[in-house]
């Protein structure tokens, strides 16, 4: 069986394990994009530590959960966002102002929408977490 969207599968795995109350989960297959998204989630305190496990194939991520996620998921299609449109997309995908975060990919790498706003750059929406 092939996966159509490994990032969507990873976010669903995190959400399901968080809802059940598990303290850790395994995300497979691993990719650079998933690793960068996990790093942004870790910076904002939505997950604890995570580590890459090399299994001889594509690898896995072992993620420690801290119980802060109410909902998370990917944004499809991956809308392009200009530097002055962040407010519109915050209202569309986040439940309240200054609550949660959008994860975006920009020419400068994967980051939160707060950081992209601060730097004055646009990008493409990848995921949301709150």
Curated annotation (Swiss-Prot):
One GO process term, biological-process aspect: translation
Any one Gene Ontology cellular component term annotated for this protein: ribonucleoprotein complex
One GO MF term: rRNA binding
InterPro entries documented for this protein: Ribosomal_uS8, Ribosomal_uS8_CS, Ribosomal_uS8_sf
Stored SUPFAM superfamilies: Ribosomal protein S8
Pfam family, one: Ribosomal_S8
Keyword annotations from UniProtKB, A to Z: Ribonucleoprotein, Ribosomal protein, RNA-binding, rRNA-binding
Gene3D superfamilies: 3.30.1370.30, 3.30.1490.10
Function field: One of the primary rRNA binding proteins, it binds directly to 16S rRNA central domain where it helps coordinate assembly of the platform of the 30S subunit.
NCBIfam families recorded: PRK04034.1
Family (UniProt): Belongs to the universal ribosomal protein uS8 family.
Subunit structure: Part of the 30S ribosomal subunit.
Name of the featured protein: Small ribosomal subunit protein uS8
Species, as recorded: Methanopyrus kandleri (strain AV19 / DSM 6324 / JCM 9639 / NBRC 100938)
Gene: rps8
């Amino acid at each position: 069986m092939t996966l159509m969207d490994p990032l969507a599968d990873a976010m669903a795995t995190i959400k399901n394990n968080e809802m059940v109350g598990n303290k850790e989960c395994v995300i497979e297959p691993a990719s650079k994009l998933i690793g960068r998204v996990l790093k942004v989630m870790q910076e904002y305190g939505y997950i604890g530590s995570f580590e890459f496990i090399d299994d001889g194939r594509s690898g896995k991520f072992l993620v420690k959960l801290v119980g802060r996620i109410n909902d998370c998921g990917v944004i499809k299609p991956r809308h392009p966002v200009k530097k002055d449109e962040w407010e519109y997309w915050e209202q569309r995908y986040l439940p309240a102002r200054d609550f949660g975060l959008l994860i975006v990919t920009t020419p400068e790498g994967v980051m939160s929408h707060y950081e992209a706003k601060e730097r004055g750059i646009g990008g493409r929406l990848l995921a949301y977490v709150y």
